Regions:
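Beta-strand secondary-structure signal
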Residues: 24-28, 46, 55, 91-93
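Acidic/histidine-enriched, glycine/proline-rich intrinsically disordered or flexible terminal extensions
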Residues: 108-156
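Solvent-exposed residues in well-ordered beta-strands and their adjoining turns
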Residues: 28-32, 59, 85, 95-97
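Ligand-binding loop in jelly-roll beta-barrel domains
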Residues: 76-105
Length: 156
């Protein structure tokens, strides 16, 4: 398995594997860990739960999914998020089509989480956090994400 990238704020560990222009992301989500609601303007995600129970939010709908439930497809520009409700570590796989800069986005945000540059609610922590957030948004946010904020964040 590839080297794991740890995000202590969301309580997730990622392993990345390129598949042509796509990206496979294996996620180990701690009990109670989550990925907050967000959207990808130009990417499709295909999520599979390998082990555990996940509360998956897709648009305005929430449902519990496990390994027997098959693949959850998230079309581009659709709000989505998830939380591990297993009471133990859960394992998921996500195929991202196309990869674009998602791996760099997740690696950089996980590094900032390890440096405690933002809070569990995603707010910058102090001046260093504000500087990091400004440069991070400059690199990764799209103009559309600012126009369509609707309480979510766009990720590449």
């Amino acid at each position: 398995m590839a080297e794991l990238v740890h995000d202590p704020v969301n309580r997730v560990r990622y392993a990345f594997q390129r598949d042509g222009e796509n990206l496979i992301v294996d996620c180990a989500v701690d009990s109670g860990g989550s990925l907050p609601a967000h959207r990808h303007p130009r990417q499709v995600e295909r999520w599979s739960v390998l082990d555990g129970q996940i509360r998956f939010r897709l648009g305005n709908t929430e449902r519990l999914i496990g390994s027997a439930d098959g693949e959850m497809v998230v079309t581009s520009d659709t709000d989505h998020g998830l939380a591990n409700v297993s009471g133990r570590e859960a394992h998921l796989r996500c195929r991202v089509e196309p990869a674009l800069r998602l791996q760099a986005f997740l690696e950089e945000s996980a590094a900032a989480a390890r440096e405690r540059l933002f809070t569990a609610r995603g707010l910058p922590r102090g001046l260093a956090g504000a500087r990091w957030a400004a440069t991070f948004l400059e690199r990764y946010a799209t103009r559309q994400s600012f126009l369509n904020r609707r309480n979510s964040c766009s990720a590449p």
